[in-house]
């Protein structure tokens, strides 16, 4: 019983150390069966997929170039006057208007 348990543990450890071994063999078999035009792989990537990637990158670059770049200031924001510079006319007029006086409520005696 102990011998069987040890064998199972050894087999489990050996398969855990090299789990892709069967996959590598099967992928080599598939590569051998394919015609030579489909075997052209460079760095694990076929020529077709490389061409597809290049076309996608080129189209992405073209679409980015065609899109207008957003301007930094799209809306006019009121600017704070720098010390020593006069305020714009509209702000000067607003400052000259008299402000309504605050009346304190009368207290009942």
Swiss-Prot record:
Modification Pyrrolidone carboxylic acid, positions: 17
Region of interest (Disordered), residue spans: 17-109
Predominant location category: secreted
Keywords on record: Pyrrolidone carboxylic acid, Secreted, Signal
Comp. bias regions, Low complexity: 35-109
Tissue specificity statement from the Swiss-Prot or TrEMBL entry: Found in saliva (at protein level). Secreted from the submandibular gland.
A single Gene Ontology CC term: extracellular region
Stated induction or repression of this protein's expression: By isoprenaline. Prolongend stimulation does not change the percentages of secreted forms (with gliadoralin A 1-90 as predominant form).
Keyword Transferase: no
Signal peptide span: 1-16
Coiled coil segments of this chain: none
Localization annotation: Secreted
Post-translational modification: Predominantly proteolytically processed at its C-terminus before secretion to produce the major form gliadoralin A 1-90. Further proteloytically processed after secretion to produce minor forms. Potential substrate of transglutaminase.
Disulfide bonds: none
Propeptide: 107-109
TM helices/strands, residue ranges: none
Function according to Swiss-Prot or TrEMBL: May play a role in the formation of the protective mucosal protein pellicle involved in the reinforcement and protection of oral mucosal epithelial surface.
Protein name: Gliadoralin-A
